[in-house]
Amino acid sequence: MTSSLHRPFRVPWLLWAVLLVSTTAASQNQERLCAFKDPYQQDLGIGESRISHENGTILCSKGSTCYGLWEKSKGDINLVKQGCWSHIGDPQECHYEECVVTTTPPSIQNGTYRFCCCSTDLCNVNFTENFPPPDTTPLSPPHSFNRDETIIIALASVSVLAVLIVALCFGYRMLTGDRKQGLHSMNMMEAAAAEPSLDLDNLKLLELIGRGRYGAVYKGSLDERPVAVKVFSFANRQNFINEKNIYRVPLMEHDNIARFIVGDERLTADGRMEYLLVMEYYPNGSLCKYLSLHTSDWVSSCRLAHSVTRGLAYLHTELPRGDHYKPAISHRDLNSRNVLVKNDGACVISDFGLSMRLTGNRLVRPGEEDNAAISEVGTIRYMAPEVLEGAVNLRDCESALKQVDMYALGLIYWEVFMRCTDLFPGESVPDYQMAFQTEVGNHPTFEDMQVLVSREKQRPKFPEAWKENSLAVRSLKETIEDCWDQDAEARLTAQCAEERMAELMMIWERNKSVSPTVNPMSTAMQNERNLSHNRRVPKIGPYPDYSSSSYIEDSIHHTDSIVKNISSEHSMSSTPLTIGEKNRNSINYERQQAQARIPSPETSVTSLSTNTTTTNTTGLTPSTGMTTISEMPYPDETHLHATNVAQSIGPTPVCLQLTEEDLETNKLDPKEVDKNLKESSDENLMEHSLKQFSGPDPLSSTSSSLLYPLIKLAVEVTGQQDFTQAANGQACLIPDVPPAQIYPLPKQQNLPKRPTSLPLNTKNSTKEPRLKFGNKHKSNLKQVETGVAKMNTINAAEPHVVTVTMNGVAGRSHNVNSHAATTQYANGAVPAGQAANIVAHRSQEMLQNQFIGEDTRLNINSSPDEHEPLLRREQQAGHDEGVLDRLVDRRERPLEGGRTNSNNNNSNPCSEQDILTQGVTSTAADPGPSKPRRAQRPNSLDLSATNILDGSSIQIGESTQDGKSGSGEKIKRRVKTPYSLKRWRPSTWVISTEPLDCEVNNNGSDRAVHSKSSTAVYLAEGGTATTTVSKDIGMNCL
């Protein structure tokens, strides 16, 4: 019973207790009257006769006792149940006459229930509490066991976790070395780095070099070695620590970073603490001081700028190498005072008091908190716009601070090259000025720089001398502007700027013979090309030497035409070309030689050059003889001189139908010309660059191309040149050359680049034969500068030089005397009396050789020199017109006294049968009334045809033209309009030297008119020859 009292009270137990009482009542010898209350009205087998509901009692069976159950909560006692209690166990448990609670209340309902039993009648009406106070720490054995187990498990988990954390921290430090994310000093290797073992007691401060914001710099002596000592006060201790730590970063040694020796601290005589940084001594001092005392040439200036850039690029580079790691470093105070100059002319970067180590988006700078401001530091004059505005990109600190350094580097570039002597040719170099010194003076304020740099977006001004169109100067200006760009993201990186500075030095190396600045009308590409063939003959003759950069103003006046020439090459060789040398500027050379033999325009006579040029090639290339004939007033005033009669097997005259207009000129589209006029010098420079690298140089010694100008067919010769005697009444003779010595002309491919000459095409006879230029005879070629051709109207009449060339054989890798004889004449005479039967078979063989293949066709897709004009300088028209007037008079009147007609009208006319044997058909022009008129110079380089009779014969149209005569201009450059090589006429080349009218002859005349002076050039057994066309017959014989 005792154990049951100690157990927690539950309602089912009470029911079982009542059941037990009821079941054992029968065993009791005495009936007991007890108080009764049962709210649940459970039927426990008690008869209704025993329960008295009026007074709430029950008559218990014998052996039963009374019990009561109360609930005590919040000071109130509520009766739960009363009745008879029949128990099994010790009867002494309920031997009390009163209902006394002697046991501790059970834990049911937090100990609020009270139970008692007694053995007298109605003893259970009330109850009495009589039990000891409960224990303050009563713990049941199961609960104590669970608590101890929880404590043990928690302690073990914490211990294991602590061990893991310690192991991870140790492993992280071992793997990353001195790296740490954050702003605090954590570099284990750096902290463990040993200072150089130097005794600072031997350090002596000799003289003060300079003083800055954070200390003074002295020249000192350490162990009898000159050193520079930077002294910091106690107030600037943080700058000392930071600069010392930057110098001690692993892999910090570099040629363009100041060499650090040792850093230490000491007490002064008055007890103050000072900090010393001992560094290598640089006698030239800072870059600012050096530039104020010295000027430099282009190479030295590039060396200064390149070395600073190289040092900054190394600072900005993150460099892991083995066990060492160098983070990227931002200087943050880069200016010309913090750059030192070494004895070899290179620079080193110093003063790292404000520098930061950069690790991604975080910074490493000892002594600063995470929210430390990284803006508004450094020298105000060199602050970038974003720093002045307080708009540094804190999300990408690494890139932002590098861009700040690049802005300052651009200002240093400007300071360095403002003292470059090569950039100020012909004038004194300006005194040294710091950046923005002209705008804000020597002591600018923060607000001044904000207004100037951030709001007004101004930068230091480039001088007028830097406005020249030079590749070097232009690249320099672009580099500087890309460094100090207003947009920080658009600035160059230090590595890119280093490459650009190296390229500037390479440009100078390639252009040693010229200054980096050139004349305005010259392009950098012309400088490059002029260097490859700078051997020029001296200027000879009455006319100035026009270089490739010359251009011609558009003019319709006769003698008021203005020719501007600004040479991009200031130095010329004083040694003339001799035999055996290859002159690449052949057109210019020919013109100079011709001018040298002309005393004046008024007394021009025919002269023959005796100087020849030879070409050494590595392959078998055709060799052609070349000579120059200038204008001849008249045969009776002077005579033709010839030397070295050609050695030929059997000279044979050749008779061919003289034709003109096998070539057709593609006229320029005015829209295309306008487009060319609008092109800037930048596009011209790019065009020249692309042209240079798009194909091989046609003038190189290894090129197999033979290039022919359109007006003067000038080619180069190998070996000794011979000339035949040409006099009045003597025909032009062509020597017989053995077929074994004839080699086909090389094939000239149509390279995909800008053509350098006019194309070939045959005009349809149904089309209009000429292009109308209008009343003022203006050319459709407009003025174009630098790289675009210009053509003026040409009104003055003048006989043009005719070059007669013949191919010989050039041996491999050595010179061979050519067997080809070349005879040249201008409006010369050809005698009659040549045998027609010899002409027939000789001309037939020549025409067959022309149709062999493409390799035998001469290509005129390019000229011998892309720098030189297509036309020679025109002679003054005063005396020449008089000469041509006499020529016209002689053409119009019959022969007198057997004298040969100067225009070959009656010189050995060939029979029609001879002409048909060559496959060439001629149609005689109907005679018409002859009207004497004055010959005039053509308005443009026009080779269009008037009438086409068949595939091999073309009649030359002629019409009258009115206009004033005047001196013409020459074409200095090719027009950029693309030409196409449409079709070859393999039978003949016809290049007219007689001007054709600017208006179309549409007067309905049946007479086929001819040019008074034309030249037909044709191939004959691998050679070339020229002759003139007759006005009456339209053909002539050689």
From Swiss-Prot:
Modified residues (Phosphoserine): 586, 680-681, 843
Localisation per UniProt entry: Cell membrane
Membrane topology type: Single-pass type I membrane protein
Region (Disordered): 593-626, 746-769, 872-974
Regions of compositional bias (Polar residues) in chain numbering: 909-924, 937-964
Keyword Cell membrane on entry: yes
PROSITE patterns named among the record's database cross-references: PROTEIN_KINASE_ATP (PS00107), PROTEIN_KINASE_DOM (PS50011)
Amino acids binding ATP: 209-217, 230, 280-282, 337-338, 351
Spans within the Cytoplasmic topological domain: 172-1038
Start and end residues of each Protein kinase domain: 203-504
GO aspect biological process, one term: negative regulation of chondrocyte proliferation
Intrachain disulfide bonds: 34-66, 60-84, 94-117, 99-116, 118-123
EC number, as in UniProt: 2.7.11.30
Cofactor: Mg(2+); Mn(2+)
Residue positions the entry lists as glycosylated: 55, 110, 126
Compositionally biased spans, kind Basic and acidic residues: 872-896
Signal peptide: 1-26
Pfam families to which the protein is assigned, alphabetical: Activin_recp, Pkinase
EC supergroup of this enzyme: transferase
Family: Belongs to the protein kinase superfamily. TKL Ser/Thr protein kinase family. TGFB receptor subfamily.
Complexes and interactors: Interacts with GDF5. Interacts with BMP4. Interacts with SCUBE3. Interacts with TSC22D1/TSC-22. Interacts with activin A/INHBA.
Protein's job: On ligand binding, forms a receptor complex consisting of two type II and two type I transmembrane serine/threonine kinases. Type II receptors phosphorylate and activate type I receptors which autophosphorylate, then bind and activate SMAD transcriptional regulators. Can also mediate signaling through the activation of the p38MAPK cascade. Binds to BMP7, BMP2 and, less efficiently, BMP4. Binding is weak but enhanced by the presence of type I receptors for BMPs. Mediates induction of adipogenesis by GDF6. Promotes signaling also by binding to activin A/INHBA.
Listed name of the protein: Bone morphogenetic protein receptor type-2
Species in which this protein is naturally found: Mus musculus (Mouse)
